[in-house]
Swiss-Prot record:
It is a multi-pass membrane protein. It comes from Rattus norvegicus (Rat). Its main location: mitochondrion. One of its GO terms (cellular component) is respiratory chain complex I. The keyword Transport applies. It is found in: Mitochondrion inner membrane. One of its GO terms (biological process) is reactive oxygen species metabolic process. Belongs to the complex I subunit 2 family. The gene is Mt-nd2. This is NADH-ubiquinone oxidoreductase chain 2.
Length: 346
């Protein structure tokens, strides 16, 4: 692809969520969503293969449907109230339609079916954008209108997402699908706490991005799209695979790593709001997620098959210089931030 075209595309992807976050006008929020949607489509279909074309088509159809629902809500709301923002007096049906359409954009269960398939059909670096930056705009809209959300629907979306994210990742061998189901589970945690303490949603999103970025960097460094590829890469880049194991445990929420912080804070806040059943179910599903992360670490580091690969261990000096600095820094942040919990939560 032409470098100038790539610059324009990435700039549009960057500006879309920024416009959405900085707007209180529903129409401008919708414009920001559409900018990021239309800009990422060429990246999804850039690799000329049936799988990438299928991924781009599925992504476009799902996101376009959600965008049409959002635009319909905006028009009907303006017709009823004469305002370009949602109010307490807004029709409940319109609020529920907005919530469901944003759930489709985020990949929350039961509207999650497109996310693993799309992530599986695209390159790792585009998958990183899809699972991190593209989540910011819909979440920012939910954050602005969190007081208007229906708690029942929000709870159903949250608990179903946590269940799907935990169970869906159990039988996967493709690393991109594992990260997709991880994203679904984390979005469920963010949605669960949104009606009660939206600031914890922002904290969870920040830590989720902080954990997902180094995980994808390690996968890209080894070109690892399957668990078997990761296990074969152990004799070449043992330090990177060690960091991968630590990041996976942090993603699973194992104390005392950073990933434990948002789960701890969210469960505490849910208990304060008398949501003991919800918090118990989510804690059980968190253990299930931790199990398949641990199983992934076991399969890629402790079950190495005999190999005739005589290639020498790759020194960190011969790897990408950017990764030499970024990856250790992000790994430290993704493992040792728990002592700052009191400052982060307050």
């Amino acid at each position: 692809m032409n470098p100038i075209t790539l610059i324009i595309i990435y700039f549009t992807i960057l500006m879309g969520p920024v416009i959405t976050m900085s707007s209180s006008n529903l129409l401008l929020m919708w414009v920001g969503l559409e900018m990021s949607l239309l800009a990422i489509i060429p990246l999804l279909a850039n690799k000329k293969s049936p799988r990438s074309t299928e991924a781009a088509t599925k992504y476009f159809l799902t996101q376009a449907t959600a965008s049409m629902i959002i635009l319909l809500v905006i028009i009907l709301n303006y017709k009823q109230s004469g305002m370009w923002t949602l109010q307490q007096q807004t029709n409940n049906m319109l609020l529920n339609m907005m919530l469901i359409s944003l759930a489709m954009k985020l990949g929350l269960a039961p509207f999650h079916y497109w996310l693993p398939e799309v992530t599986q059909g695209i390159p790792l670096h585009i998958g990183l954008i899809l699972l991190t930056w593209q989540k910011i705009a819909p979440l920012s809209i939910l954050y602005q209108f969190y007081q208007l959300l229906n708690p029942t629907i929000t709870t159903i979306l949250a608990i179903s997402s946590v269940f799907v994210g935990a169970w869906g990742g159990l039988n996967q061998t493709q690393t991109r699908k594992i990260m997709a189901y991880s994203s679904i589970a984390h979005m469920g945690w963010m949605t669960a706490i949104l009606p009660y303490n939206p600031n914890l949603t922002l904290l969870n999103l920040t830590i989720y991005i902080l954990l997902t970025v180094p995980m994808f960097i390690t996968l890209m460094t080894n070109s690892a799209t399957t668990i078997n590829t990761l296990s074969l890469a152990w004799n070449k880049t043992p330090m990177i695979l060690t960091m991968t194991s630590i990041i996976l445990l942090s993603l699973g929420g194992l104390p005392p790593l950073t990933g434990f912080l948002p789960k701890w804070a969210i469960i505490s806040e849910l208990l304060k709001n008398n949501c003991s059943t919800l918090s118990t179910l989510m804690a059980i599903m968190a253990l299930l997620s931790l199990f398949f992360y641990t199983r992934l670490i076991y399969s890629m580091s402790l079950t190495m098959f005999p190999t005739n690969n005589n290639s020498k261990m790759i020194s960190h000096h011969h790897q990408n210089p950017k990764h030499n600095f970024i990856l250790p820094t992000l790994t430290v942040l993704s493992t040792l931030t728990l002592p700052l919990s009191s400052q982060l939560i307050t």
